């Protein structure tokens, strides 16, 4: 059963394919191929590739198929060679019956592009059936008074063959009294008449037994025989006579079995048995005998089987009325079968293309044929589909229709369509058939990938581990399949100085971003680049997004002491007057941190000291000040270790070692210029220093003698230590100036200027009152406050 269903589906598909061929060659003459019935299966008929002017490969590539209305597939097309073969042995009598010629139409369907070629298979009859008499014995009663030349109808033989192979002649065994005349019924059938040659004499020959032979026209001819028994009777000179020689009736095809079709009537003027009439069919075919029956007494004709207009539309019957004396008459009954709307329309799907691309307007989705076996309005059909689908029906040739997309489809809105094709005939009552088709929509790359954000901000802590992810980007594509597969990539940087290829990489499959090297906040605080998302469609579509990477500072730099310089060969020694009061500014530790934020917030503390409690360090600015008055017991040389610590986590630190020399007075002021010229922004500060030096020089000339005497008296006094100025990488950060002014030699000033300072401040160290001045009240004048002149320095 499954094999039959599968075979039926294949036949239906073949039929659907033929639709395409008919559309392109509907107006051309059909291709004709001839084959004799009973030809063996597999017989070669023709090469379709040559007939159609196509190559064998093209025939196969275009999906050539055979479509026919037959319920069985009688032809087979070889896709490899293009040969058309006979798929089964044919019986012309079964396929066409008495119809001549026996033509089996079919169509050749080609796709890509769509074409239909009409073709016909003509089945030639062979002489495979011998004539057959339904009754092997025929009885006749003939009056002896019958005039020579009288004719008597005999039962005709049946031959299923047609044309020259059909029944062509009758003969009778040789005798002196009878011969056979052959007559044509006008419908392609012949029947025999027995003709009397001479007067009969019942007393001499009361009965004849003759052999009736029916011959067909085949080569060699076939024959069939029947025995004719003739009984010679006394005189019966009136034959039955029908009231009408021709009866025409119309019978609906849905008439029930047993219903009366028509009643015929004949009269006989004789009496007795010679006037008794019996009705019967004369030379009736087997189909007529299966469909009708006649009452031999009343002459009423009844249905013996159900009529079918779609099979046979007209029956022609010859009815014979025979009396008891053997005389007979005949009439003709023509039965026209009227059509009733008893067949629903049939939808024969030839081709279905599914799935179809979403951007394909005016695309043929399906080809089908509508067939209604009824006639007239009962066979006329109307085909439609629902309104809510983007498809239309287009009629074609020979009741073919194509289902075509009305506009481009959108797979992202509908992935499939369920289409109901409704076919309704115009009969009464109307019959309809519905056929459902599911059309899948295949994806086309019409949507570019879309990032979830137009820009991404990533925070990466410096000193990160290379090859670890630092973030990710994500894009989605509304398409499906490979059209929705997204490939991520880095786009070329718009900054030519940014080595993007050595900084980050991206996973092409998932969009994860990786740092290729450890980032250094001090070298690169932030950078940005663009990433692309490209699908795998054809052509590929893409989109972009901006990625900003902010490098977070880590506490990876220890404080660096700028002053005093720690790696100098000569240690920095700061002089400190023994008369300094508590809070006296000895020096200032200057340090920087390469980090930022709280990692660069520096704090200072005194770690070690020769005399604990003598000095203190301000935590926020690194100023080293005296914590108490100096005494004679304090060592002349003091060593301080200052700890500089940042505010990172964990904190980093550095130490600065200071040497402080306790002195009773100052030596000649000194002026040490920086190795590099100051910036133009500090020119005003330089002018101020020069002016101060000039005034001090004038003052020095007036007290030179006094100073010389005092210096000689203090030959044993310790020289004033000098502080080396940082060199190397920080030539412009600090400028130390020393000089003498117009004041007394007992005063010494040290001016510390920062080359990069924006405040243009300078500081005077407070004057030292030497022990040479006994008249001094011991009061020291402190000028330790920052001084800023009115010109804005």
From Swiss-Prot:
One of its GO terms (molecular function) is calcium ion binding. One of its GO terms (biological process) is cell adhesion. Residues 710-793 are cytoplasmic. GO terms for cellular component: plasma membrane. The chain crosses the membrane at residues 689-709. It comes from the Eukaryota. Coiled coil: none annotated. InterPro entries: Cadherin-like_dom (IPR002126), Cadherin-like_sf (IPR015919), Cadherin_C (IPR032455), Cadherin_CS (IPR020894), Cadherin_N (IPR013164), Protocadherin/Cadherin-CA (IPR050174). It is found in: Cell membrane. Keywords: Calcium, Cell adhesion, Cell membrane, Glycoprotein, Membrane, Repeat, Signal, Transmembrane, Transmembrane helix. Residues 35-133, 138-242, 247-347, 352-451, 456-561, 568-671 form the Cadherin domain. The keyword Disulfide bond does not apply. Residues 27-688 are extracellular. PROSITE patterns: CADHERIN_1, CADHERIN_2. Residues 1-26 form the signal peptide. Potential calcium-dependent cell-adhesion protein. May be involved in the establishment and maintenance of specific neuronal connections in the brain. Glycans are attached at residues 169, 418, 436, 567. The keyword Ligase does not apply. It is a single-pass type I membrane protein. This is Protocadherin beta-7.
